[in-house]
Amino acid sequence: IVKFDHAANGFRDCIRDNARIKAADVHLTVEEMIALCGGTILPDAYQPPADSSPRDLAGLWDVVSEAPRDWNRWIMQLREFESRSDSQMQVFLPLAHLRGGISDFDRKEENIRSLLDKLQRKGVVDDRSSAAALEYTYNSRLLRFCTEKAGNVLEVKTLLEGRWVQQKDVPYFGDCQMSVSIDWDGIVHDPGERIPETRNEIDVILMHGTVPLFISCKNGNIGEEELYKLHTVAERFGGPYAKKMLIATELDRKSPAANRA
């Protein structure tokens, strides 16, 4: 039986006279760390398959990194079109059925065709579109997830890079999680109870032994409110030695957030 000693940021053996356990001998999961600090993680967040690697995103990342701001706009338009498809993996969109329901249709269609061409060349989709319809298939569930929201691809890339960091041929981070939604009091109430909940989502959390690394990912610039959220959550659920990291595809070094970071 062990207990977590917040003052010492370590563990003590409750059976052996509170003897301190070496940090190297203790490895916590993200869920265990949050639970020890009084919170709980909401279930069902998507996690990439265990055998995924950064190479799986190489082509897609080329498209995103070339034009991060354009990517945000493209994904908003893509989702507007794809929301009208019965399947989200094998997309089929007859244009005659869409034209009357989407504003500025011609410009958006042109943008999407241009994007699909880029994704086709990078191996993200199999594009079979014609003049009458947009028709394409995502080449994996992981790649499909990365286009559901503009920021997903940066989160996934960060997570996969973390999984592959090694020290002496051993994974440096023992547990890696993304889209971690934390309930602050550890009690998940039924929505019908109408009890106010305090929750925050952290893009990526990596665990090295008992030390968590809280990461905020932004496909674009970072506002000061993101700095505040990251600091607050890490301080509450990470202990005194928690580490924090901001990752942004475009960071204005003159912005207040950049100066504070």
Question: Would you name each region that the model predicts?
Answer:
Residues 7, 21, 34-261:
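Intrinsically disordered, low-complexity Ser/Thr/Pro/Gly-rich regulatory segments
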Residues 24-32:
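Acidic, Ser/Thr-rich peripheral helices and adjacent loops at domain boundaries
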Residues 1-21:
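Nuclease catalytic cores that cleave nucleic-acid phosphodiester bonds
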